[in-house]
């Protein structure tokens, strides 16, 4: 009986020691690593400009009779930037992505889905109104200014042949390249 009591006592002591040892080995410390980055963006795009709609005026098909003829009704396409910091970068270019017309490859194809005008595309220009912006091609250099500014591009109808009446629609997604 003494052996049984001694064996039971040793078993209890060992079990208690194991539990105590397990508690002593519990992981109670750790670490968390935080990573981040403070940036100095060149400019911030004004939200209202990000997804804008430009409505062109109606134009007579008689103004678009031959390939390459423009209507002469250029409309401003403003893109507003704010908080520009020229200590970060002084220059930008834009890339206007979209479907190029197959005849006038520097113009955006008419993508109207119903009652579409034929032989008409949309030509974008730099602010000077003469330098064409080709789809998916970087524009020329634009000098940035400190603070807020509006960069103005232009758009006009351009004939790809003898135009017929109907709807004209094109979409371009743009990317600003700072350098």
Curated annotation (Swiss-Prot):
The organism's superkingdom is given as Bacteria
Q: What's an example GO BP annotation here?
A: cell adhesion involved in single-species biofilm formation
Keywords (alphabetical) are: Fimbrium, Signal
What subcellular locations does the record give?
Answer: Fimbrium
- Please name the SUPFAM superfamilies in this protein's record: Bacterial adhesins (SSF49401)
Q: Which Gene3D superfamilies match?
A: Fimbrial-type adhesion domain
User: Which GO cellular component term is one of those annotated?
Assistant: pilus
Q: Where is the signal peptide?
A: 1-21
Q: Which Pfam families match?
A: Fimbrial
Inducing stimuli: Expression is negatively regulated by H-NS and subjected to cAMP receptor protein (CRP)-mediated catabolite repression.
Q: Where are the transmembrane segments?
A: none
- State what this protein does: Part of the elfADCG-ycbUVF fimbrial operon, which promotes adhesion of bacteria to different abiotic surfaces. ElfA is the major fimbrial subunit produced by this operon.
Q: Which family does it belong to?
A: Belongs to the fimbrial protein family.
Q: What else is known?
A: The operon is cryptic under classical laboratory conditions, but is functional when constitutively expressed.
| Name of the protein in question | Fimbrial subunit ElfA
């Amino acid at each position: 009986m003494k052996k049984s009591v001694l064996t039971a006592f040793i078993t209890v002591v060992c079990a208690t020691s194991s539990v105590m040892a397990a508690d002593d080995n519990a992981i109670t410390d750790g670490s968390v690593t935080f990573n981040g980055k403070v940036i100095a963006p060149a400019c911030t795009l004004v939200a209202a400009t990000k997804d804008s709609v430009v409505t062109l005026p109606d134009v007579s098909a008689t103004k678009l009779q031959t390939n390459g003829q423009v209507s002469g009704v250029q409309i401003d396409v403003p893109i507003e930037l704010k908080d520009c910091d020229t200590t970060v970068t002084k220059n930008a270019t834009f890339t206007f992505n979209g479907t190029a017309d197959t005849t006038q490859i520097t113009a955006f194809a008419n993508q109207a889905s119903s009652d579409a005008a034929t032989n008409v595309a949309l030509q974008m220009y730099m602010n000077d109104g003469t330098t064409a912006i080709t789809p998916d091609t970087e524009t020329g250099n634009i000098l940035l200014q400190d603070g807020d500014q509006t960069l103005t591009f232009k758009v006009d109808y351009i004939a790809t042949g003898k135009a017929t009446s109907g709807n004209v629609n094109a979409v371009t997604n743009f990317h600003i390249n700072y350098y």
